[in-house]
Every structure is written in structure tokens, then in C-alpha cells.
Amino acid sequence: MQNIEFRDKQYLLRRKIIVLCIAVFCSSNLFSQLRQGPNLPDHDTKPYHFGINIGFNKSHFLFSHHPIFLQRDTITVVESVNNSGINLAWLVDKRLGNHFNLRLHPLDLTFSEKIFQYSENYSGDTTFLEKKVSSITLAFPVHLKFSSDRINNFKVYTIAGFKYDYDLTSNAGKKNAEELIKLKKGDFSVEVGLGFHFYFPVFVLTPEIKLSSGLLNLHSRDENLRYSNVIDKINSKMITFSITVE
């Protein structure tokens, strides 16, 4: 048995070493292409650019308690927890000048899940529970992009703009939902971000980090829902790290 476990550990170690070697080889090969002179020299002068974007997000709700929360002694704690999700988008970039671009995402899907944690006290016994709010959001962001001068095969940029979100799975219209926290379908957010362009021979690789802050109250409050009536306003917050290939 010990020999089998030892062989398994050796096998896993060999696999990790092989994967690491492949990753190092690929990364060194890619970055060597960045040092071979200007790639895609006419890329930035084209009127339009198109790309595919995939991202990873961390999101949570910023909320305020309703006065009824202080009047009750059963629900003693309400918290919003960070959770992860993914983004898939199609990028359309319109050149406005040497340093400015208008960026649109005609198709931008965000898959996320928000979690509320509750602490309830009944007859001296405290219980903890979670309420999850899953969403598939169709977003319509509009960003103004300001770029630095290109240095060989590298460029840095910042973005700022607005985004409208439409939740395809909103539960605001559901009835008899004692266990639900009802959320409205639409939200309007402001966004800022920072990104980097790496120019390769046949494509541009763009990592980007972006912050989103919702402006509208998402909470569709219902006096009859005990997990909802202790909350007043709910605003969305999200940070996204994404990779775009143009």
C-alpha cells in the first residue's frame, strides 16, 4: 500500500513538473515574440477593432438595514459575502483619435451569485443560514478609453464609463416566496478600469481589471418576506479581471 501511494505521488509530481515546463516554455516563447520588433504596426490606426473577452469576477451587495431590523430580535445579523463568477463578452472598439477610443460590448453576459448570511436567535439558540441570489446578467457597457503611446509591443490604458445591467433571472415578480430576497431586473453602474495591450504577431492580448459600482436600489422590498423586510437598500459592487484577444 505504501509503495502504491509513493508511486502515485511520484506520478503526480512528474505531471506537475511537465505542466510547469510546458507553461514556462510557452510563456518564454510568447514573450520572446514581444522582443522581436513591432508586431501589427498598423493595428492602432484601424477605425474598428473586434475582440473576444472572458473574465473572472468577485461581487457582493452593499446594503443598508431597514428600521424594522432594530425592532426585531429574531434576525440578529445580516451580512453580504463576496462570491465569484465569470464574464463572457464580445468587444467592439471604435478609434476616435491617437489616444482615445470608444468601446462597446454588444453582447456581455455575466454569471454571478450573491450570498446573504443571516444569524437567527430563537429561545436563546442561534442558527446561521445563507440565502443565495444567482443571476445571469445581460450588460450594455459604454466606455471611453484613454491610451498611452505605444512602446514597442506594449501599451497601457485606462477606461471610464457606464453600464446598464438587465438580470435575466430576476425574481422580483415571484409570489409566495418566503425564502427569497427579491431583486429588480435593471441596474445602472459606473465603471473604471486599467488595462495593458501586448502586441503579438497575429493578435493583441489585453489583460484588464475593472471596478463597477451600482447606482440604483436593486431591492424589491416585501413586508411579508422575513429575510427581505429587514433590508432597505441594496447596491451591487463588482471587480472583474478579464483577458481580451483582438
PLM regions: where:
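Short glycine/proline- and aromatic-enriched beta-strand/turn motifs that initiate or cap beta-hairpins
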Residues: 31-84, 246
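Flexible, solvent-exposed loop segments that connect beta-strands
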Residues: 64-79, 111-135, 168-183, 218-232
